[in-house]
Amino acid sequence: MLRRIFVSTFLVFGIVSLYAKDLEVSVRSEISLLPIHVELKIGPNDAKQQKYLRSLCNTFISDLALGDRLQPSSVKSEALSPPFSIAIVSRYPEIAFTIARGSQNHQQFHSLVLTEDISSNRQKIHEAADKIHYALTKVPGISSGKIVFSLSKNPQDGELKQGELWSVDYDGANLRALTQENSLSITPNWMNIGNCNPYLYVSYKYGIPKIFLGSLENTTGKKVLNLQGNQFMPTFSPRKKLLAFISDTYGNPDLFLQSFSLSKGVMGKPRRVLNETFGTQGNPSFSPDGSKLVFVSNRDGRPRLYIIQIDPEIQTPRLLTKKYRNSSCPSWSPDGKKIAFCSVIKGVRQICLYDLSTGKDYQLTTTPIDKEGPSWAIDSQHLVYSAGNSGESELYLLSLITQKTKKIVIGLGEKRFPSWGGFPNNQ
């Protein structure tokens, strides 16, 4: 019964809507692509590894193209000389990446050593591509991050729904189970701190929703809070070392703040930011500097987005979205300039964007199938979200630059609550 009650609460804010397919984007950011020639130079003793090396080269080219700013190609045009060329030089298991501008000589930029671990090798290629992407564009590459999400299958009659957390690369590769709790695990949210790639999530393994700490290195989640009642929708500010979450400790689902660090854990007692006079609250998301929160409240009868200043002191929230009156799932962009969110438009839940510099709302998707849970890549120009119908849901990438969306092919099951993060701090 409790699980049904709180799944209903998620439904109020559009967290567990179930629906999407081919998608369109109605806002475009024009950026000229920079042509790049990529050449694989296989060492004289590497003939046996030729097929594998070519597959890694293809992955590298896809990684460079992912950010929609570079136009890499292994085919050199006689008519057009690209401004940059990259050579991948193999002396298996060593690989060196060299870069040349125009007709200048190649200079080594990066090197790595391959191992027997295929997954690890792919990650090394992703990280190399992102470093080169940043060097050429001064914009972070986005191929080295991981997408964590909840994967569940339809329960049999009378069974409670179960879902485990998984991680995957942007292209559907390196699919990996992160939890084995035989329960319902939802709403993972990257903390973006440290080298252990920690994330917060909610699990029902104790019967009611509680917040846990997990990581790619340790798949056994650790309970974070010892509060009565239900806690859900966690998000973290690494700048302020603050955990924001929703709890019904006082009866109403309210917004709370809790000081927290990986080394010390919970510090002090949680603070209730707003009380029941501000309606049912949900979906908090921090600004990059941790001074503000965007969240959802049904104070005026329908869920709408509000922003509240929490540092240096808590102030009165202000309404953010006046255009859309049934909104949920806000996600503040890493550059602090935009907030992605969901809103019901003509009966369909769409992905929308709020531009903080202009105060304007934009509808990003238009197809008649519900979309949910947008999460930003580190470049603030790409999103991942879930979309599908009842019993089915897939993950999609969305580019604000090209207007294009792309399905992440994973397999059967409902994929929901994606969170894009875990980017190495080396760009």
From Swiss-Prot:
Pfam families: PD40. GO terms for cellular component: periplasmic space. The keyword Amino-acid biosynthesis does not apply. InterPro entries: 6-blade_b-propeller_TolB-like, PD40. Keywords: Periplasm, Signal. The keyword Signal applies. Belongs to the TolB family. This is Protein TolB homolog. It comes from Chlamydia caviae (strain ATCC VR-813 / DSM 19441 / 03DC25 / GPIC) (Chlamydophila caviae).
